[in-house]
Swiss-Prot record:
<dbReference type="InterPro" id="IPR036291">
    <property type="entry name" value="NAD(P)-bd_dom_sf"/>
</dbReference>
<feature type="active site" description="Proton acceptor">
    <location>
        <position position="245"/>
    </location>
</feature>
<comment type="function">
    <text>Catalyzes the reduction of malonyl-CoA to malonate semialdehyde, a key step in the 3-hydroxypropanoate and the 3-hydroxypropanoate/4-hydroxybutyrate cycles.</text>
</comment>
<dbReference type="Pfam" id="PF02774">
    <property type="entry name" value="Semialdhyde_dhC"/>
</dbReference>
<dbReference type="InterPro" id="IPR005676">
    <property type="entry name" value="Asp_semi-ald_DH_pep-lack"/>
</dbReference>
<feature type="binding site">
    <location>
        <begin position="332"/>
        <end position="333"/>
    </location>
    <ligand>
        <name>NADP(+)</name>
    </ligand>
</feature>
<feature type="binding site">
    <location>
        <begin position="180"/>
        <end position="181"/>
    </location>
    <ligand>
        <name>NADP(+)</name>
    </ligand>
</feature>
<feature type="active site" description="Acyl-thioester intermediate">
    <location>
        <position position="150"/>
    </location>
</feature>
<dbReference type="InterPro" id="IPR012280">
    <property type="entry name" value="Semialdhyde_DH_dimer_dom"/>
</dbReference>
<keyword id="KW-0521">NADP</keyword>
<dbReference type="InterPro" id="IPR051823">
    <property type="entry name" value="ASADH-related"/>
</dbReference>
<dbReference type="Pfam" id="PF01118">
    <property type="entry name" value="Semialdhyde_dh"/>
</dbReference>
<protein>
    <recommendedName>
        <fullName>Malonyl CoA reductase (NADP)</fullName>
        <ecNumber>1.2.1.75</ecNumber>
    </recommendedName>
</protein>
<dbReference type="GO" id="GO:0004073">
    <property type="term" value="F:aspartate-semialdehyde dehydrogenase activity"/>
</dbReference>
<dbReference type="GO" id="GO:0051287">
    <property type="term" value="F:NAD binding"/>
</dbReference>
<dbReference type="GO" id="GO:0046983">
    <property type="term" value="F:protein dimerization activity"/>
</dbReference>
<comment type="subunit">
    <text>Homotetramer.</text>
</comment>
Length: 357
């Protein structure tokens, strides 16, 4: 039986933080023992958190005292999960890594550091070896590993089996992203009610950059950010759903490609987490539906087992002999954030990168 690992969750009262708490409360060997928060230090977690997810605050953590983000108080912590906001996260994560802590970050601050892995466990698990380079280059015993933008994961996971099996030449993506992607309290109601809000060229470019990096690592053993064989573009929007990012992708190929073969490649797709039977790995990373009006955010965002860990793909269509269309749905705060972070931690444990400090 695997020994228990102690986890700290930074920003434990935020929208992603509460998903970490929920998913780790009954995890077989990673336990949330240190809940860090700003403005609520010293108070019981269950009393101060706005529990904006399924179920109730787990009894295992309800009476835990919220603590400051102070490495001196975390001596016995094995893993740090960091869903801190952009800008604030980077210096804090570096401080912890320098002190020997193992940091899994959902923040963008280190996603494009050349020695920092940006991991989707089913897609590019081999990039964990960058940790060795990171430790050597930065002369620290800890590490920082990042998870990609939730939107990038919603596209990259279904694109991976296509990229592995067919000669892609281009992808055009349009997204409709839920409110929780903007954090709490989020967007002003008068900006989003009765509206679809374009996220702008900066967010579009960030999405493309991350998908490009992820796919560039599918076929290569060395990380080459920005290098790929396909042309990518994304147009991103915020809509008034709470959880779940909806994405429409048009994929073009260098030769005639049958949509039925593409569907089969998605249905059969599995990765290392499934082979290793990691606790948070869904049996199917991609669930393909042939129902005409699916996926739908309301019905499908919690797909998979554990719930919310599968990407649902539907509405596959042969547009012309060299173009197919599909729609994907990802639970942005589960698979796209906390669940992806927990699965990454499990992979790192299995690979020997996380053990007693």
């Amino acid at each position: 039986m695997r020994r228990t690992l102690k986890a700290a969750i930074l920003g434990a009262t935020g929208l992603v933080g509460i998903e970490y708490v929920r998913m780790l409360a009954d995890h077989p060997y990673i336990k949330p023992t240190y809940l860090a928060g700003k403005g609520s230090v010293g108070k019981p977690y269950g009393e101060i958190v706005r529990w904006q997810t399924v179920g109730n605050v787990p009894k295992e953590v309800a009476n835990q005292e919220v603590k400051p983000t102070d490495p001196k108080l975390m001596d016995d912590v094995d893993i740090i999960f960091s869903p801190l906001p952009q800008g604030a996260a980077g210096p804090v994560e570096e401080q912890f890594a320098k002190l020997g802590f193992n940091v899994i970050s959902n923040s963008p601050d280190h996603r494009f550091d050349m020695d920092v892995p940006m991991i989707i466990p089913e897609v590019n698990p081999h990039t964990v070896t960058l940790i060795d380079e990171q430790r050597k280059r930065r002369d620290w015993k800890g590490f920082i590993v990042t998870t990609p933008l939730c939107t990038a994961q919603g596209a990259a996971i279904p694109l991976t089996p296509i990229y592995q099996n067919f000669k892609m030449s281009g992808v055009m993506i349009t997204t409709m992203q839920s409110l929780s992607g903007a954090g709490y309290p989020g967007i002003a109601s008068l900006d989003i009610v009765d509206n679809a809000l374009p996220l702008g060229d900066g967010y579009d470019a960030k999405t493309v950059k991350e998908i490009t990096r992820i796919l560039s690592e599918v076929k290569r053993n060395v990380q080459e950010p920005g290098v790929n064989e396909i042309t990518l573009d994304a147009t991103t929007h915020r809509i008034a759903t709470i959880h779940g990012h909806y994405e429409v992708a048009y994929v073009t190929f260098k030769e005639d490609t049958d949509v039925r073969k593409v569907m089969e490649s998605m249905e059969s797709f599995k990765g290392e987490p499934q082979d290793l039977k990691l606790p948070t790995a869904p049996e199917k990373p991609i669930i393909v539906t042939t129902q005409d009006a699916r996926p739908q955010v309301f019905f499908d965002r919690w797909a998979g087992n554990p719930p919310g860990m599968s990407v649902v793909v539907g509405r596959l269509k042969q547009v012309n002999p060299r173009t197919i269309r599909f729609v994907s749905l990802i639970h942005n705060t589960v698979r796209g954030a906390a669940g992806g972070g927990v699965l990454t931690a499990e992979l790192l444990v299995e690979k020997g990168y996380i053990d007693k400090r």
